Curated annotation (Swiss-Prot):
SUPFAM superfamilies: DNA repair protein MutS, domain I, DNA repair protein MutS, domain II, DNA repair protein MutS, domain III, P-loop containing nucleoside triphosphate hydrolases. Belongs to the DNA mismatch repair MutS family. This protein is involved in the repair of mismatches in DNA. It is possible that it carries out the mismatch recognition step. This protein has a weak ATPase activity. ATP binds at G616, P617, N618, M619, G620, G621, K622, S623. It comes from the Bacteria. InterPro entries: DNA_mismatch_repair_MutS, DNA_mismatch_repair_MutS-lik_N, DNA_mismatch_repair_MutS/MSH, DNA_mismatch_repair_MutS_C, DNA_mismatch_repair_MutS_clamp, DNA_mismatch_repair_MutS_core, DNA_mismatch_repair_MutS_N, DNA_mismatch_repair_MutS_sf. PANTHER family: DNA MISMATCH REPAIR PROTEIN MSH1, MITOCHONDRIAL, DNA MISMATCH REPAIR PROTEIN MUTS FAMILY MEMBER. One of its GO terms (biological process) is mismatch repair. The keyword Transport does not apply. Keywords: ATP-binding, DNA damage, DNA repair, DNA-binding, Nucleotide-binding. One of its GO terms (molecular function) is ATP binding. This is DNA mismatch repair protein MutS. GO terms for cellular component: cytosol.
Length: 851
């Protein structure tokens, strides 16, 4: 630990360090010393472990050795990238004073703070994934949740009542950094995440949030953004804005608005559904064999990020969806998607370049990327000029051209500039007369030095005499020691080497001062011109962001057109009737990884057929069939074409899945508890317009308990909720449900035995399966034959003895728990604080009649 109580006991340099560290106590401080960034004390110990760098000790301060670790200044980006991946933050401290005029340590300042959620440096970001920072707040009644993408300026807020929704939002947005108040009572939902930041309560104060946001947007109030009444969400947004301002230490002109996300505008998916459908991450945590991997052939990183946002937030607005479908169809019919893709590949990641421009951290090569993008826009306009499709024209208009800015960048910036402005050589020759003159003076040194060298050779008669330069001693005349007796008296010795002597003369010293002054002046002028370039671009930021947004959307639509043509997808029909009708549907991911042809299957769900009881052997394809239905419905709700011969899809508000489970050891929940929690979420939140996938409910407990729960869940979904439901089960007793209730049907996936082998047909057929083929699957898995034979004998015994096999059990009547009285059910559903006196009186009379 650092003791700063007696700071005067420390050396002046360590006093400076400790003062800066006190301003940034919770993050690693990289302190510039010469060609290294140094870390001291606890920071050094922590960095040595995280970055695998040496921990040493240097001298003493306040009587104690100083633990120290360091990294070369030119390699800092690689170390920062590693820290960001680990969820850590860093403060970069640079020398800002002039060593020549400084008394004591050179003045240093923290010039930037890098955190996982606010990083904008290209080298520290994954280019095809959003990098979000989020804040969560709970006011005792509801949650407020805000997200910001500093790389694009997108700023969203949301508020909701349920913990399940918080989990779903965290799964959907996957923030790199999450801010939460000190009193946050739901830490169990965020523990284990990287980038957690606990913030003081006052940062979530509503009045402060309103003031901060109004200052940022230059408005009197927040009414125009439609967020004024969302007070809990605004508390989270205020903390978010304050944190970003504190870390960036500059204006944020690209953050121009905040939007309230409306749950009723989206097809809602909980965390389990996103995980089970493997949208952008597979069950093992990777990217391979996900929906995004199959769909994403976008030409630009910003298009790739937009596609993933669409996948994670399917929408219900039929006008927008049909507009996307129509645009995709147009790009296919006019064969435009390939040419568009080729042009857009030259555009690159304009969105993040503009963010760095707004933050004034844009590097010279960012400007060349902008120049390259601007150069493609006229060609893109020509490509789309003759197209009369309304949506295509609107996108073309939004992706406007910027000829003046293109001309400026072509005149101002070198074709291939260096990485950093501090290296010079960024501004093109001919752009500024004063800069050209200074460069001529600095670059003319070679010719002048040759002239001086030839003259001195002639005057001294020393043919081996050389004029040279190094950074330590400047310009010099070098003479071999053997010829040193020939050196004139006005030569002043500057350096003695083993075999040579180095001298200086007045003319060379004056020329050195002149050249070095010209170089310094040229670099200072070049930096000023570069800043002026940024100043010229910044007023166009809003238009540039709008153009980047249109280019990203055009990229996604062209990509979806290419995917539809390449993968044989068809345009789904969005209908108003309660129906899901898919002909020859396919799983978009499984069909790409299979070596054998994929067996396409139909599905029909409608008012009189809202639940399918699905039976069949393990490995028969039940889960694939269920998931493909959900993915086809999801694709239809991002406006994409779908893997099917045809699809008619009615209104959907939510997609739920209860497929597979594992222990949640961190929360102390068993597999069965996880299964029941997910099931409860479905039963409490599904509606008649929800799509529900239920796979093997009840298998984590005893046969009778599991069967009873499965039966009751199926009844609830079918009769009370009326959701579109695919209910896969090994409880063959459930196949009796269609006989007992309306709106249900049996389907099955069959298999055929050939001697000791089994062939799975993968084709969905009407009716219930005749058997499960469990022993055959066990044999395929390599279970020893002796075990299989013993299992066959046991199966025969059970089939002859158990009432389950003979159909004698009526699962709905199995007494698991005491059946509650209707009056108790009614009372449990009552919310007393929400009842008017009249409603309370009516309730009393209603309860009395129920006794």
């Amino acid at each position: 630990m650092i003791n700063i109580e007696n700071i005067q006991q420390h050396t002046p340099m360590m006093q400076q360090y400790l003062g800066l560290k006190a301003e940034n106590p919770e993050i690693l401080l990289f302190y510039r010393m010469g060609d290294f960034y140094e870390l001291f004390y606890d920071d050094a110990r922590k960095a040595s472990q995280l970055l695998d760098i040496s921990l040493t000790k240097r001298g003493q301060s306040a009587g104690n050795p100083i633990p120290m670790a360091g990294v070369p200044y030119h390699a800092i980006e690689g170390y920062l990238a590693k820290l960001i991946q680990l969820g850590e933050s860093a403060a970069i401290c640079e020398q800002v004073g002039d060593p020549a005029t400084s008394k004591g340590p050179v003045e240093r300042k923290v010039i930037r703070i890098i955190t996982p959620g606010t990083v904008s440096d290209e080298a520290l970001l994954s280019e095809r994934q959003d990098n979000l920072i989020a804040a969560v707040y709970h006011d005792g009644r509801r949650f407020g949740y805000g997200t910001m993408d500093i790389g694009s300026g997108r700023f969203f807020i949301n508020q909701f009542d349920k913990e399940e929704t918080l989990l779903a939002e965290l799964q959907r947005t996957n923030p790199a950094e999450l801010l939460y108040p000190e009193s946050f009572a739901f830490l169990q939902h965020v523990e284990g995440r990287r980038g957690l930041r606990r913030r003081p309560e006052w940062e979530f104060e509503l009045g402060t949030a309103r003031k901060l946001l109004c200052q940022q947007f230059g408005t009197q109030d927040l009414v125009g953004f439609g967020v004024d009444k969302s007070e809990t969400a605004l508390c989270a947004a205020g903390c978010l804005m304050q944190y970003v301002k504190d870390t960036q230490r500059t204006a944020l002109p690209h953050i121009r608005s905040v939007r309230l996300e409306q749950p009723d505008h989206a097809v809602i998916m909980d965390a389990a559904t996103r995980r089970n459908l493997e949208l952008t991450q597979n069950l093992a945590g990777g990217y391979e064999n996900t929906l995004a991997e199959v769909l994403d052939r976008t030409a630009t990183p910003m298009g790739s990020r937009l596609l993933k946002r669409w996948i994670h937030q399917p929408i219900r607005d039929r006008v927008i969806l049909k507009g996307r479908q129509s645009t995709i169809k147009e790009l296919i019919e006019q064969n435009l998607y390939d040419e568009l893709g080729a042009l857009l590949r030259q555009v690159g990641d304009v969105e993040r370049v503009l963010a760095r421009l707004a933050l004034r951290s844009a590097r010279p090569r960012d400007l060349t990327r902008l120049r390259q993008a601007f150069a493609q826009l006229p060609e893109l306009q020509r490509l789309l000029a003759d197209n009369r499709h309304e949506a295509v024209q609107q996108l073309a208009e939004r992706a406007s051209t910027f000829p003046e800015l293109l001309s400026l960048l072509e005149r101002a910036v070198m074709e291939v500039p260096p990485v950093l402005i501090r290296d010079g050589g960024v501004i093109r020759d001919g752009f500024n007369q004063e800069l050209d003159e200074l460069r001529d003076l600095a670059n003319g040194a070679t010719a002048s030095l040759v002239r001086i060298e030839e003259r001195e050779k002639a005057l001294t008669g020393i043919n081996t005499l050389k004029v040279g330069y190094n950074r330590v001693h400047g310009f010099y005349i070098e003479v071999s020691r053997a010829n040193s007796h020939l050196v004139p008296a006005h030569y002043i010795r500057r350096q003695t080497l083993k075999n040579n002597e180095r001298y200086i003369i007045d003319e060379l010293k004056k020329y050195e001062d002149k050249v070095l002054t010209a170089q310094a002046q040229a670099l200072a002028l070049e930096k000023r011109l570069y800043e002026e370039l940024l100043d010229t671009l910044l007023p166009h930021l809003g238009d540039l962001q709008e153009s980047a947004s249109a280019l990203a959307e055009l990229d996604v639509l062209a990509n979806l057109a290419e995917r539809a043509e390449t993968l044989d997808y068809r345009c789904p029909t969005l209908i108003d009737e309660d129906q899901i009708l898919i002909e020859a549907g396919r799983h978009p991911v499984v069909e790409q990884v299979m070596s054998d042809p994929f067996i396409a299957n139909p599905i029909r769900l409608e008012r009189e057929r809202r639940m399918l009881i699905i039976t069949g052997p393990n490995m028969g394809g039940k889960s694939t069939y269920m998931r493909q239905t959900a993915l086809i419905v999801l694709l239809a709700h991002i406006g994409a074409f779908v893997p099917a011969d045809s699809a008619h899809i009615g209104p959907i508000d939510r997609i739920f899945t209860r497929i597979g489970a594992s222990d949640d050891l961190a929360s102390g929940r068993s597999t069965f508890m996880v299964e029941m929690t997910e099931t409860a979420n479905i039963l409490n939140n599904a509606t008649a317009r929800s799509l529900v996938l239920m796979d093997e409910i009840g298998r984590g407990t005893s046969t009778y308990d599991g069967l009873s729960l499965a039966w009751a869940c199926a009844e609830q979904l079918a009769s009370k909720i009326g959701a579109y439901t695919l209910f896969a089960t090994h409880y063959f007793e459930l196949t009796r449900l269609p006989e007992l209730m309306s709106g249900l049907a049996n389907v099955h996936l069959d298999a055929v035995e050939h001697g000791d082998t089994i062939a799975f047909m993968h084709a969905v057929q009407e009716g219930a399966a005749s058997r499960s083929y469990g022993l055959q699957v066990a044999a395929l898995a390599g279970v020893p034959k002796s075990v299989i034979n013993q299992a066959r004998h046991k199966l025969a015994e059970l089939e002859s003895a158990t009432p389950l096999a003979t159909g004698e059990v009526r699962p709905a009547s199995i007494p698991l728990l005491p059946q509650s009285h209707p009056v108790v059910d009614e009372l449990e559903a009552v919310r007393p604080d929400e009842l008017t006196p009249r409603q309370a009186l009516d309730l009393v009379y209603r309860l009395k009649q129920m006794l």
